[in-house]
Amino acid sequence: MAKDAITGARTRFGNQRSHALNSSRRSWKPNLQKVTVKINGAAPKKVYLTARTLKAGLKNGSIERV
């Protein structure tokens, strides 16, 4: 299973609850994107990042897309 290379985000599991509070298992998957980036000026590398991590990294300058 893939995970975010920076934050380590991966699939989370929990319960889906109906109006009657019946439960069934469900999962929440992160929005993973496979991108080629330079992280802190290192050599370009293909990694999985969540859209949220990618957006934040591009904004603060720690990630550069190649």
UniProtKB/Swiss-Prot annotation:
Gene Ontology CC annotation, any one: ribonucleoprotein complex
Molecular function as annotated in GO: structural constituent of ribosome
One matching Pfam family: Ribosomal_L28
Chain intervals for the UniProt region annotation (Disordered): 1-26
Record-linked InterPro entries: Bacterial_rp_bL28, Ribosomal_bL28, Ribosomal_bL28/bL31-like_sf, Ribosomal_bL28_bact-type, Ribosomal_bL28_sf
Biased composition (Polar residues): 13-25
GO biological process: translation
Keywords on record: Ribonucleoprotein, Ribosomal protein
UniProt superkingdom: Bacteria
Family: Belongs to the bacterial ribosomal protein bL28 family.
Name of this chain's protein: Large ribosomal subunit protein bL28
Gene: rpmB
